[in-house]
Amino acid sequence: MTEQQWNFAGIEAAASAIQGNVTSIHSLLDEGKQSLTKLAAAWGGSGSEAYQGVQQKWDATATELNNALQNLARTISEAGQAMASTEGNVTGMFA
């Protein structure tokens, strides 16, 4: 029978890395939006309106992506904690 081993520190590191990526993505998206906002300020008429519509869709999709990544990071972390707790309980049964 193969022995099952968990790397709890590795699981938590993965969750933290995903959360760090969420922060980086958010910063990059904000930076890009600020640059585009400066450019869009020079536009007028229907071109500006069309841009605003696309920007709103982009913002909604970016928010959805970041929320999904945050949920993934939280779920991985919670699963790691639950597995560590279970491991501790099982170990305690044999101590």
Curated annotation (Swiss-Prot):
One annotated GO biological process: protein secretion by the type VII secretion system
Subunit structure, as described in the record: Forms a tight 1:1 complex with EsxB (CFP-10). The complex persists even after secretion. Recombinant His-tagged protein forms dimers and higher order multimers; how the protein is prepared influences its multimerization and its subsequent properties in vitro. In vitro EsxB only interacts with non-acetylated EsxA; it also interacts with C-terminally truncated EsxA (missing the last 10 residues). The native EsxA-EsxB complex dissociates at pH 4.0, and EsxA may then be freed to lyse (host) membranes. Another study using recombinant protein did not find dissociation at acidic pH.
Name of the protein this chain belongs to: 6 kDa early secretory antigenic target
Impact after mutating residue 14 to R? Wild-type virulence in an esxA deletion strain
Q: Which family does it belong to?
A: Belongs to the WXG100 family. ESAT-6 subfamily.
According to the record, the segments passing through the membrane are 11-43, 49-85
- Give the principal location in a single coarse category: secreted
Task: List cellular component terms (GO).
Answer: cytoplasm; cytosol; extracellular region; host cell endoplasmic reticulum; host cell plasma membrane; host cell surface; peptidoglycan-based cell wall; plasma membrane
Which residues carry the post-translational modification N-acetylthreonine, per the record? 2
Taking the record's annotation, the residue ranges forming a coiled coil are: 8-39, 56-87
The UniProt-reported impact of residue 94 to Q is:
Does not restore virulence in an esxA deletion strain, wild-type secretion of EsxA and EsxB. Partially inhibits host TLR2-signaling
Annotated SUPFAM superfamilies: EsxAB dimer-like
Q: Where is this region: Not required for ESAT-6/CFP-10 complex to bind to host macrophage and monocytes?
A: 85-95
The protein's gene is named esxA
Changing residue 21 to C has the effect of: Cannot be overproduced and purified
Q: What is the effect of changing residue 37 to C?
A: NBD-linked protein does not fluoresce at acidic pH in presence of liposomes, this residue may face inwards in membranes away from lipids
The misc remark on file is: Genes esxA and esxB are part of RD1 (part of a 15-gene locus known as ESX-1), a section of DNA deleted in the M.bovis BCG strain used for vaccination. Deletion of this region is thought to be largely responsible for the attenuation of BCG, and esxA and esxB in particular are very important in this effect.
What is known to happen upon mutating residue 60 to C?
Answer: NBD-linked protein fluoresces at acidic pH in presence of liposomes, suggests this residue faces lipids
Cite the post-translational modification comment. Answer: Upon purification from strain ATCC 27294 a C-terminally truncated peptide (missing residues 85-95) has been found; it is not clear if this is physiologically relevant. An additional unknown modification on peptide Thr-86-Ala-95 has also been seen.
In UniProt terms, what is the effect of altering residue 83 to I?
Answer: Wild-type virulence in an esxA deletion strain
Mutation: residue 74 to Q; reported impact is: Reduced liposome disruption
